[in-house]
Amino acid sequence: LGKRIAAGGGIEDGLRVLELLARHPSTARFISFKLAQRFIADEPPASLVDRAADVFTKTDGDIREVVRTILTSPEFYSPRYYRNKIKSPLELAASAIRATGAATDAAAPLVQAVARMGEPLYQCQPPTGYSEDSSHWLSSATLLERMNFAVALIGNRINGTRVDISRLATPETKDQKRLIDNLIAALIHSDVSRETRENLSKV
């Protein structure tokens, strides 16, 4: 750090070191990068990381302002980074339960499903937690488990969890196009590509 601290300061020496670390430019950039990686992309744009790091420094490390900078940035709303992140297994399971309106009173089967998808809860060995990098969640085995989870959920094959299919496919949606539109609106909350629509119409 390029600083010399005289001996004999006791606990104050330790606090001084922590303060030097907290105010170091590398700390501002590291924290800003990790937050941008969490909310934007595995490799967030350097320009955004720089702006967030500048806010971190100017606000004396106010994380709220750093997050505000990221979430209100043009990059956050850019089509290039829209839905750029792969959900972790826990995020996938929670959002699927919410999107389908499933009723559940059994945590164990869901926790087991999350573990099979690669994220055994509270069992991450490094103290830093599970990776924010999408590649950590993507493999042929974990993708298969994600598909199995989706099929089991919508097929009501997860013990203690029920999905009301009629909520997603009402009598008014017998027309295939309307059914696909309703499912996309309920589960995706925005449009999908023409190729995806064509593939759905073949199911």
Predicted regions and their residues:
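Flexible, low-complexity segments enriched for small/polar residues
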Residues: 24, 28, 32-59, 68-203
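Nucleic-acid-contacting surfaces of polymerase cores and analogous helical-repeat interfaces
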Residues: 1-39
